[in-house]
């Protein structure tokens, strides 16, 4: 995919940061020495970590040069590096791995999450938040439009870019076997957006990227027009024109006990 657009992502900065704050509130660590923000994006989650743990050595990691540039602008005193979470082997072992809205882009959760948990220092935490919205109309309709002509051939792989979120029992079993106690929950946020175009603008910064990046400008415009029309059928507006977008997210905090 093309590089992430930090400005597009930050159009909804407050809404995207709230789940990170909710995740951090459940982390049971008073004074971790080493904290790594996995998929730090433009630094909005890193900023929360700096505020809570001002004495910690904090490192933000992301694959996107654009996101890292924005993170460095926001937090010039924090270390940021370009790195792939999928192959991460942190040394020395961190006390907190914080993964807000990143692991849904990576496959093989049955092996990935236990590997990350085992990389922690004793007593350390893996804190994860992932959008769990693949079966919401906002995402089902992306796949439906992508399967129509003239998009189907060019977008055949787009739907596979996101990983299926597993069940509570699967994550609990995988992380318990890795020597952790597990706190897991699901929250549905309801975002009031400015019409159906508001939903389009929201997902353009994240979920729509695999569907738009393979298309030229003309095809993108046609895709977005069809997608917005489909959204208008799925999300009835409020009396004042706002549209309510339910957005479920899965959270877990795994603490290494052995």
Curated annotation (Swiss-Prot):
UniProt xrefs under HAMAP family: Tran_acon_Me_trans
Protein name: Trans-aconitate 2-methyltransferase
Pfam families in the cross-refs: Methyltransf_25
This protein's GO CC annotations: cytoplasm
NCBIfam families hit by this protein: PRK01683.1
Keywords (A to Z) from UniProt: Cytoplasm, Methyltransferase, S-adenosyl-L-methionine, Transferase
PANTHER family: TRANS-ACONITATE 2-METHYLTRANSFERASE (PTHR43861:SF1), TRANS-ACONITATE 2-METHYLTRANSFERASE-RELATED (PTHR43861)
Biological processes annotated in GO: methylation
Free-text function comment from the UniProt entry: Catalyzes the S-adenosylmethionine monomethyl esterification of trans-aconitate.
Catalytic activity: trans-aconitate + S-adenosyl-L-methionine = (E)-3-(methoxycarbonyl)pent-2-enedioate + S-adenosyl-L-homocysteine
Gene label: tam
Lineage: Bacteria, Pseudomonadati, Pseudomonadota, Alphaproteobacteria, Hyphomicrobiales
Protein family (similarity comment): Belongs to the methyltransferase superfamily. Tam family.
Segments passing through the bilayer: none
Gene3D superfamilies with a match to the protein in the record: S-adenosyl-L-methionine-dependent methyltransferases, Vaccinia Virus protein VP39
Highest taxon listed in the record's lineage: Bacteria
SUPFAM superfamilies listed in its UniProt record: S-adenosyl-L-methionine-dependent methyltransferases (SSF53335)
EC number(s) per entry: 2.1.1.144
EC class of the enzyme, as a word: transferase
Subcellular location per the Swiss-Prot or TrEMBL entry: Cytoplasm
Molecular functions (GO terms): trans-aconitate 2-methyltransferase activity
CDD domains recorded: AdoMet_MTases
């Amino acid at each position: 995919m093309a590089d992430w657009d930090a400005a597009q992502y930050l159009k909804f900065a407050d809404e995207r940061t709230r789940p990170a704050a909710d995740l951090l509130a459940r982390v049971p660590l008073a004074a971790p020495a080493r904290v790594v923000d996995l998929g730090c994006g433009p630094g909005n989650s890193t900023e929360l970590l700096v505020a809570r743990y001002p004495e910690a050595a904090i490192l933000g990691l992301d694959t996107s040069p654009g996101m890292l540039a924005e993170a460095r602008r926001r937090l010039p005193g924090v270390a940021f590096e370009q790195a792939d979470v999928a192959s991460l082997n942190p040394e020395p072992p961190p006390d907190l791995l914080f993964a807000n809205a990143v692991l849904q882009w990576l496959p093989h959760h049955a092996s990935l999450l236990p590997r990350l948990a085992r990389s922690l220092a004793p007593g350390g935490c893996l804190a994860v938040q992932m959008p769990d919205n693949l079966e919401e109309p906002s995402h089902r309709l992306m796949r439906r439009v992508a399967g129509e002509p003239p998009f189907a051939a060019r977008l055949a792989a787009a739907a596979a870019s996101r990983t299926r979120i597993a069940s509570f029992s699967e994550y609990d079993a995988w992380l318990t076997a890795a020597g952790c106690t597990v706190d897991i929950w699901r929250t549905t946020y309801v975002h009031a957006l400015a019409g159906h175009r508001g939903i389009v603008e929201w997902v353009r910064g994240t979920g729509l990227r695999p569907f738009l990046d393979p298309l030229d400008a003309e095809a993108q415009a046609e895709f977005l027009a069809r997608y917005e029309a489909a959204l208008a059928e799925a999300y009835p507006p409020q009396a004042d024109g706002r549209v309510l977008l339910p957005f479920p997210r899965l959270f877990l905090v795994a603490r290494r006990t052995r």
